[in-house]
Amino acid sequence: MSTNDNWYIEHFQPTGSAIGFRISGKLDEVQSPFQKIEIYQTTDWGKLMLIDGAVMLTSRDNFFYHEMISHPALFTHPAPKRVVIIGGGDCGTLREVLKHPGVESATQCDIDEQVTRMSEKYFPELCDANHDARAELLFDDGVAYMANCPAGSVDIVIVDSTDPVGPAEGLFNKAFYESCFKALKDEGILVQQSESPLALLDLINEMRTEMGKAGFQSFKTLPFPQPCYPTGWWSVTMASKQANADFAFRQADAQAKGFDTLYYTAHLHTGVLVAPPFVAKALGE
């Protein structure tokens, strides 16, 4: 990464590319016990959060990610009541989950409290649900939390993590997925951010392989635009305990949802279930 001439530029080595934002000033910086968190004011994208020099979110486009890691899984499950979010310290995913009135509890477990405190200060619009009676915010190791989660107690596990390095490295392996598998009920769904399908299909395949080793039987990777991330195209991957799951969703409920979204719709959900040919071929779909 580099900062020069009022631009913040993140270099992405796997594709020999970069993404940049014009900035008007640095608002804050905190070194937590786990990582460095920085907040910048941009000229066109609102506020920008970096973690260890990598772009995490902007005010302008975070809705793509937060909606797609939440609503497809919640509308795919027949009746989700208990949701666990591992990571998600900016609280945007928690906000989207708790838009669903049928959800009775949502526990967010992020290892770094400072991410949440910075989000509350600089991205308060993401933290609307933090004081919802159904919300529980924990600041602990997500790997340990899932290992100790009672068997068959959770409907959906959302892994809203940073890239598979540093504090998030343990969230991308068989042992962690085994804990998720154990905690989920029979109709439960695991959903995890799965990087760029344009640049990192090998990593997505590795994730799905590790999930399969842990017992998951069916997988579906959903691509979506994410302008602030490398390549501008991102994905989430859903995993089911059920063999040959088709990931059909409650289309009527999605069409009649009683809350606003900026990107997710029932029609979009239908379309995103059909992977582009090069993605389908690489993932064996």
UniProtKB/Swiss-Prot annotation:
<feature type="binding site">
    <location>
        <position position="66"/>
    </location>
    <ligand>
        <name>spermidine</name>
    </ligand>
</feature>
<comment type="pathway">
    <text>Amine and polyamine biosynthesis; spermidine biosynthesis; spermidine from putrescine: step 1/1.</text>
</comment>
<feature type="binding site">
    <location>
        <position position="90"/>
    </location>
    <ligand>
        <name>spermidine</name>
    </ligand>
</feature>
<dbReference type="GO" id="GO:0004766">
    <property type="term" value="F:spermidine synthase activity"/>
</dbReference>
<protein>
    <recommendedName>
        <fullName>Polyamine aminopropyltransferase</fullName>
        <ecNumber>2.5.1.16</ecNumber>
    </recommendedName>
</protein>
<dbReference type="InterPro" id="IPR035246">
    <property type="entry name" value="Spermidine_synt_N"/>
</dbReference>
<dbReference type="Pfam" id="PF01564">
    <property type="entry name" value="Spermine_synth"/>
</dbReference>
<dbReference type="Pfam" id="PF17284">
    <property type="entry name" value="Spermine_synt_N"/>
</dbReference>
<dbReference type="InterPro" id="IPR037163">
    <property type="entry name" value="Spermidine_synt_N_sf"/>
</dbReference>
<comment type="function">
    <text>Catalyzes the irreversible transfer of a propylamine group from the amino donor S-adenosylmethioninamine (decarboxy-AdoMet) to putrescine (1,4-diaminobutane) to yield spermidine.</text>
</comment>
<feature type="binding site">
    <location>
        <position position="35"/>
    </location>
    <ligand>
        <name>S-methyl-5'-thioadenosine</name>
    </ligand>
</feature>
<feature type="binding site">
    <location>
        <position position="110"/>
    </location>
    <ligand>
        <name>S-methyl-5'-thioadenosine</name>
    </ligand>
</feature>
<dbReference type="GO" id="GO:0008295">
    <property type="term" value="P:spermidine biosynthetic process"/>
</dbReference>
<dbReference type="InterPro" id="IPR030374">
    <property type="entry name" value="PABS"/>
</dbReference>
<feature type="domain" description="PABS">
    <location>
        <begin position="5"/>
        <end position="241"/>
    </location>
</feature>
<keyword id="KW-0620">Polyamine biosynthesis</keyword>
<feature type="binding site">
    <location>
        <begin position="141"/>
        <end position="142"/>
    </location>
    <ligand>
        <name>S-methyl-5'-thioadenosine</name>
    </ligand>
</feature>
<keyword id="KW-0745">Spermidine biosynthesis</keyword>
<dbReference type="InterPro" id="IPR029063">
    <property type="entry name" value="SAM-dependent_MTases_sf"/>
</dbReference>
<feature type="active site" description="Proton acceptor">
    <location>
        <position position="160"/>
    </location>
</feature>
<keyword id="KW-0963">Cytoplasm</keyword>
<comment type="similarity">
    <text>Belongs to the spermidine/spermine synthase family.</text>
</comment>
<comment type="subunit">
    <text>Homodimer or homotetramer.</text>
</comment>
<dbReference type="GO" id="GO:0005829">
    <property type="term" value="C:cytosol"/>
</dbReference>
<feature type="binding site">
    <location>
        <begin position="160"/>
        <end position="163"/>
    </location>
    <ligand>
        <name>spermidine</name>
    </ligand>
</feature>
<feature type="binding site">
    <location>
        <position position="167"/>
    </location>
    <ligand>
        <name>S-methyl-5'-thioadenosine</name>
    </ligand>
</feature>
<dbReference type="InterPro" id="IPR001045">
    <property type="entry name" value="Spermi_synthase"/>
</dbReference>
<keyword id="KW-0808">Transferase</keyword>
<dbReference type="InterPro" id="IPR030373">
    <property type="entry name" value="PABS_CS"/>
</dbReference>
